[in-house]
């Protein structure tokens, strides 16, 4: 049995879960998320908990078991608490500003870079070098944060770029002159 897959998911108060065959819908105070579970995996509600089971121990079913349980758990956490990723910008002249719901970056290019907020994602800017990406869908929040980070990846020589808060960059020593 999968250690991740066999653990039941507690349904907090204020969260409504509907399971219709392979389709799972989770409603909570922050919004609604839905997911289609892969075919051999079955989800059910028992005693205020969601349990995810697999029919047999085939290799594919074992891998889908833990995945499906984690995705459903991420939905429950998302509609109750939400997800936030904080980021920092390092570099002279590098800054970010909130323009309506979108982010405008000044990253040393000849033009400002604009990132539009997809549905369900909100941006917050603290000062002009710190920002946070928030939403209820863990995958969307992480994807947008990765797209923002990719705009100007950290330079190992100068330490300039966009990074996640608390991320340590391995610095390199430059060439030594003769």
UniProtKB/Swiss-Prot annotation:
Chain ranges passing through the membrane: none
A Pfam family this chain is assigned to: Ribosomal_L6
One GO-annotated biological process of the protein: cytoplasmic translation
Record-linked InterPro entries: Ribosomal_uL6-like (IPR000702), Ribosomal_uL6-like_a/b-dom_sf (IPR036789), Ribosomal_uL6_a/b-dom (IPR020040), Ribosomal_uL6_bac-type (IPR019906)
Role, per record: This protein binds to the 23S rRNA, and is important in its secondary structure. It is located near the subunit interface in the base of the L7/L12 stalk, and near the tRNA binding site of the peptidyltransferase center.
Description of how the protein assembles with itself and partners: Part of the 50S ribosomal subunit.
Protein name per its UniProtKB record: Large ribosomal subunit protein uL6
Native organism: Corynebacterium diphtheriae (strain ATCC 700971 / NCTC 13129 / Biotype gravis)
